[in-house]
Amino acid sequence: MLLSWLTGLGAGLLSLHFLQKLLFPYFWDDFWYLLKVVRYGIQMEMYKLRGELVTVLDKFLSHTRKQPRKAFIIYEGDVYTYEDVDKRSNRIAHALLNHSSLKRGDVVALLMSNEPDFVHVWFGLAKLGCVVAFLNSNLRFDSLLHCINTCEPTAVVVGGDLLGSIEEILPSLPKHVRVWGMKDSVPEGIDSLQEKLSLASDEPVPPSHHVTSSLKSTCLYIFTSGTTGLPKAAVISQLQVLKGSVGLWAFGCTADDIIYITLPLYHSSGSLLGIGGCVELGATCVLKKKFSASQFWNDCKKYNVTVFQYIGELCRYLCKQPQREGEKDHRVRLAVGNGLSSDVWRQFLDRFGNIKMCELYGATEGNIVFMNHTGKIGSVGRANFFYSLFFSFELIKYDFQKDEPWRNGQGWCSCVRKGEPGLLISRVNKKNPFFGYAGSDTHTKSKLLFDVFRKGDVYFNTGDLMFQDQENFVYFWDRLGDTFRWKGENVATTEVADVLGRLDFIQEANVYGVRVPGYEGKAGMTSVILKPNKSLDLEKMYNQVVTSLPAYACPLFLRIQDKMETTGTFKLKKLQLVEEGFDPLKISDPLYFMDNLKKSYVPLTEEIYNQIMSEEVKL
């Protein structure tokens, strides 16, 4: 009797197992991921109950006390322990306390390349309770000046290799802004912070300078192009920094991992997910000044790297490298990032071995994140029942002719069906707030949708088209608005158009992105109308864009038109131009290509077009 009962129970459990695998194949993946999220939530609540407000800086100081001799940063072969980073950041804090009027709450802009001093200065300023604004190290002239003016800093700290960029705009900076250079010898008008460090104390900074009163207080400004206009300073709260720093842990990284970071630290991926993630874990990172496809695997083997951060373009570059022996002979087990296309994903795994690719999605300033913890190729994550407990989002219909969300006769938005691309929007509430941008409320309000499904509701507009399949996996489709991504960076079309508009022979410039086979994102293209009685100066145009814009923002293709179509609200139409691309056989208008060897734009011939399509000409 007992035997038959046990046999029946076993058969029943086995049947349930197969039924679960058939009907709910991702249940346990989702469930264990949920437990991780709940565990972290409980930890945060315990801090609150004890009256503690723990920040990423607090966690770093805790690790420093527990493991002072452990390597925190490895850079160009040099090892910086947790204690080393703590002491140098103390020196920076004391030097600024003794030689400036900086105080708690002041904004300090940071213009530095990837190097240990980026972290030293960041943490040193955090110990003073300052808000740190990360500036894109590629920016120059008006773009750089715009970002500095936007965040209204009291001071700017500049890396030794970028002093030339700040020197160019020094006369235009507000008089009260003090500029510090991380170099002994600095240009006139800039103070040497490096010079002050030798005499500065490395003793701990009194906690009273940085103890926070609320996790919603501003910690950082990180610049983002979003979907419209010039770069905006996204307000990053202490809470957002904490959330960003748990990404590596949520994907399964541990304190024993060695994490390879080549992404720029001025981006949230490099700073919050990368450096912040190492702090959360108490792990070690290998920091690189720039990504090198030829050096990547050598570094991974040399430093016993187990985890690396990526953007899709990075993985594509690695796949394009010449094959060599022992490509699967490494210790890398996880890769965390975003923007990885399905074809590169498959190619990467086939060539470099069983690495778990942890794709994620999230805007710097956004209030929603997707994390693909199942390894489903091409997906950014899965929206299941458990996920809906934490994030409320919808995919809504979009009117491409009016360039705005579609609304019915009653004024309400409507959701798309599964399999259809729709605009991703996320509910703004106490659980998932949107902190907006520095400066005018206009920028903040422009990212919000009001009265979407009912009177009074508010949603964050991501500006991204996504779709959801029958298994509830979510996929990125395309980006809307006045930006596109190229070389892993957001390009603001209005900024590029403004630079072109300063040329005396251009009447109107319409900037957009076009897809190029073999490349992630979209390459920049501009369609222009010439002023009456003015001729096109291709060399002058080339010089204008390369001196005023970062390399990734320079238009690679140029189209000359007689007239441009506009929408009912007088916005320039882009959709048809994007679809037509840059094929000289399909477009009768004159086309040109940016030739860096000739330092000019040259006619885009059928031969050049074919060389681009076959990747003989590299972009």
Swiss-Prot record:
It comes from the Eukaryota. GO terms for molecular function: arachidonate-CoA ligase activity; long-chain fatty acid-CoA ligase activity; nucleotide binding; very long-chain fatty acid-CoA ligase activity. Keywords: Cell membrane, Fatty acid metabolism, Ligase, Lipid metabolism, Lipid transport, Membrane, Nucleotide-binding, Transmembrane, Transmembrane helix, Transport. It holds the Pfam family AMP-binding_C. It is an enzyme of class 6 (ligase). AMP binds at residues 221-232. Mediates the import of long-chain fatty acids (LCFA) into the cell by facilitating their transport at the plasma membrane. Also functions as an acyl-CoA ligase catalyzing the ATP-dependent formation of fatty acyl-CoA using LCFA and very-long-chain fatty acids (VLCFA) as substrates. Plays a pivotal role in regulating available LCFA substrates from exogenous sources in tissues undergoing high levels of beta-oxidation such as the heart. This is Long-chain fatty acid transport protein 6. It comes from Mus musculus. The lineage of its organism: Eukaryota, Metazoa, Chordata, Craniata, Vertebrata. The gene is Slc27a6.
